[in-house]
Amino acid sequence: MHELVIKGGRVALDDGWAECDIGIDDGRIAAIGNGLTGRALLDSGGRWVMPGGIDAHCHLDQPVWGGAGNADDFESGTISAAFGGTTCIVPFGMPGPDMTTIGAVDRALDRSTGRAVIDYGLHAVVTMGTGPDVEAQLTELAGRGIASVKLFMTYQGFAVDDDLFFRVLDTAHSLGWIVMVHAENDAAIRRTRQRLIDLGRTDIRYHVVAHSETMEREATHRALAFAEMTGARMTIVHVSSWQSAEEVARARVRGVDAIAETCPQYLFIGSADLDRPALDAARFVFSPPPRSPRSHEHLWQALIDGGIDLWSSDHSPYWFADKIGGSQTPAFNTTLSGIPGIETRLPLLFSEGLLTARLTLGRYLDLTSRNAASIYGLADRKGRIAVGLDADLALWDPTARWTLGHKALHSRVDFTPYEGKSVTGKPTTVLVRGVPVVADGQLQVQPGFGQFVERTAANPDLSGKPVEETTPWLDS
């Protein structure tokens, strides 16, 4: 007899749907089958039992860089994630000014402990200011359950030069880590922004001009060329454009271990939204910016055929007054870049991808949990409904029709770019390690229930080997 049995559900298994029970013991899935008995029963009532989602790209409680702080901390952010069907997140140990990479991770651990309601890991981040001993810092963090690092190719204070880029790639490769890259050409962005400002063209719609598809494509190509030279495994985060998606596809043909991530805003928000009146248009400012219908169509096809591997939120939460700097006529160059999305990530794809049969069940599971688990070193515990893994589950009502709006969501952010959008399908019960975190529309656990998850190297066969044994550009 199991501690808990979920009965009567349509269960999303690796090989398809099954009408079966799930037995849970000690927080893990102990059995999958029919006729299971348990000391406690959870009747799914015909709901769809899905793996809990994994969001491997979100921002919570980050240091302030001369602007506004995040509206969501690890408590409110993980509560919002849970109500959206997500059971594990991997945000960033983002450095503040004059903060080392290790110091940034320590800060994030300190501010998350006792606050999260779902499980979480952390990505490291390297900038030009995070210390000269980057190799030693990343190696130390590898022993503390970190298995990935992010680099920026733009943003003042964050963008790395080519030398540091290569040093991080070599180190990450030798550790078996994956490198996440924000790919936009910094010099082109700064040059174009200043020209637009000099010409007085600062309406919100010029955000697309200042962050063009060409700028994203060029940086994507260059980052993947660096990965090709070093043998490093690389995720291009928030792919927004058909051009960048094609760069990833070309790199794969050349043998680059290239992973592509996109986000809901690149399918459900378009560049035309920036043509709205300024206060309305400001809700849609994020970087890279929303793109054309051509990119929407291309990215949908990439979701379908495997060109895109990851569906992440890039949740970047600001209160709206902070986002627009208190201005009633916000400009593209003064509006903070970033939108909330940690709770709407799964409902949007469930409604518009899975229920419409645009996506197969397998592709939906790959995009929302399975790939993130395997890519980011969580597959030994999370990402699938399988015996031995954590009982991280979301029971979805596939008939529930509801309207997205910031008052219906659980983030502290006071706006959503999806205000008024109707979706079908809603997670009604969410379990983390077999414990209901959300049920009957209410939070069921206290802050601190969520645990930090130590991750393993995504490519452990390389871990611990010297760089000269693992780097292609030294083979010639």
Describe each region flagged by the PLM:
Residues 1-52, 66:
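Histidine-rich, glycine-flanked metal-binding segment
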Residues 9, 27, 46, 57, ...:
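Divalent metal-coordination and catalytic microenvironments
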Residues 44-115:
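Metal-associated gating/positioning segment near the N- to mid-region
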Residues 58-72, 93-95, 121-134, 209-213:
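Active-site mouth loops of central-metabolism enzymes
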Residues 102-118, 167-181:
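Alpha-helix-loop-beta-strand connector modules within alpha/beta enzyme cores
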Residues 135-311:
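Histidine/acidic residue-rich metal-binding segments in metalloenzymes
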Residues 202-233, 309-310, 317-399:
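His/Asp/Glu-enriched, well-ordered alpha-helical/loop segment
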Residues 324-331, 387-454:
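C-terminal cap of metal-dependent C-N hydrolases
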